[in-house]
Amino acid sequence: MTKVVCALSGGGAKTAAHLGAVRALRETGLVPAHYVGTSMGAIIAAVLAAGCSLEEARRLLSDLRLRDLAAPAPSALLGYFSRGLFRPGPFRRAVARLVPARRFADLEVALTITAVDTETGELALFGTGGRDDVPLVDALYAACALPVYYPPAEIDGRRYVDGGVRAVLPLDTAARFAPDVVFAVDVGPSWRELPADGTTRVPPLVRQSGQVQRILMAAYAEEMLGRWAARPVNADPELILVQPPVRAETTFRLDLVGAYEADGYRTAAQVLAERGARRDMP
């Protein structure tokens, strides 16, 4: 049986595209044996690894509201001394509602979550291949604790932030688990993003911080994808890369979840059809 490891990028609400992409993958008969997720992609990965159907996952995601993910922190009034713009409590409660599992041991499919240790700068893994004794909601908060927006997660005396700080698309992590195929869905910051449409009001300081993070994340992703593209033809593991269209400044556009999912399905179906055509060539 072909071992498929799904690498799901960060990207906020845009990660709804992962649901559509995984649906297209399953329609080909390939079944994910392992999910590796970064940032909000880690939450989507956890929902699927817990055994939720794609329909249930879509419903859970559609029920999210902005106040669940971005509840303003009173401490933001402290200016320079604030730990983050948003309160972690509402976010953690939203994650607990989304993911019907409390421990990694409760999951039906292997799951690996990435975060970054703020002291060492190293990528930290939770779940398969890393620490699996941490409550799932703690690991998921760590994976999503994007600097400026949320305070770092504190786990056993260590502080962790969003895994996207090191690798918004966890391709290299997925490759650690001896897959035959890495099915990677990328909706994170990149140079291919369409410009913001101007409908989202973003405070200047937040926009500047987001632009810097986008540059750093996009540069790392470009370097990593370049390394993978430079591999010999037919190198193992096979990479199936799905990159749905994305637009800047839509991280919190929960009203577009349905459109993102449709984009993920359409793009993945096309990529998979092209893969099938290549494999059928003499």
Where do the model's predicted regions map?
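Helix-rich "cap/lid" substructures immediately adjacent to catalytic or cofactor-binding pockets
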Residues: 1-35
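ATP/pyrophosphate-binding catalytic subdomain of soluble kinases
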Residues: 135-173
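Short glycine/serine/threonine-rich phosphate/pyrophosphate-binding segments
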Residues: 15-18, 42, 167-171
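Catalytic nucleophile loop
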Residues: 9, 32-50
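Short beta-strand scaffold segments in enzyme catalytic cores
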Residues: 111-117, 151
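A short alpha-helix-loop-beta-strand transition element characteristic
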Residues: 99-112
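Non-catalytic peripheral regions of patatin-like phospholipases
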Residues: 2-4, 54-94, 116-118, 122-123, ...
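Conserved small-residue
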Residues: 11, 21, 41, 113, ...
